């Protein structure tokens, strides 16, 4: 075997080794990190490069579609008249995007990258409910966020710089009585008796609820969810 053949064989072996290493690392689950929990089991991971996960999001519908590696949620109807004609009612008309992430563990760590793509705030919108109608994360008028506990206090955090139309990198660590929120790298832990995601009236929970308001789309880029133990 001459020098050129040896060289080509060596290059080919190196390329195959790099490829196999890349494949192995790409298949590795994301690393678990937490300030509250010692261990966590990854139960859901999604970059929206395939079909909608029905267990977590429900069935795909015209207002909930995967596009270009994102899950995009839009209003079901564009006008009140159109909605009333289709639904045969005058309430819950689907004029704003609403979506749920289902089957949330009772103790968890969640990484989310998402945005509410809209230009202005309206009363109570957009909002992200951690537990249906429970802990609420919403925007401040001039940037930043507010966390409202159910039947409890609110916490205002301006340093996160959270703004409409911009990606939010969010980490949530939760167990009853304690929640840690890291919004765009700005993290704080809250301990209070009102920290709970359990809504006894919600037969489909615990779950996350996103409500966008008028003229809005909700866009998700990635989700990671761990079931945790202390």
Predicted regions and their residues:
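Bacterial N-terminal signal peptides
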Residues: 9-20
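Extracellular carbohydrate-recognition regions
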Residues: 28-61
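Beta-strand-rich interaction surfaces with strong enrichment in secreted/lumenal proteins
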Residues: 33-34, 96-102, 156-162, 209-210
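Short tryptophan-centered beta-strand motifs in secreted/extracellular beta-sheet-rich domains
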Residues: 48, 112, 166-183
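Extracellular glycan-recognition surfaces and repeat-rich motifs
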Residues: 52-83
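Secretory/extracellular carbohydrate-interaction modules
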Residues: 78-147
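Short, aromatic/His-centered strand-loop micro-motif at the edge of beta-sheets
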Residues: 149-169
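Flexible glycan-contacting loops in extracellular carbohydrate-active proteins
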Residues: 192-221
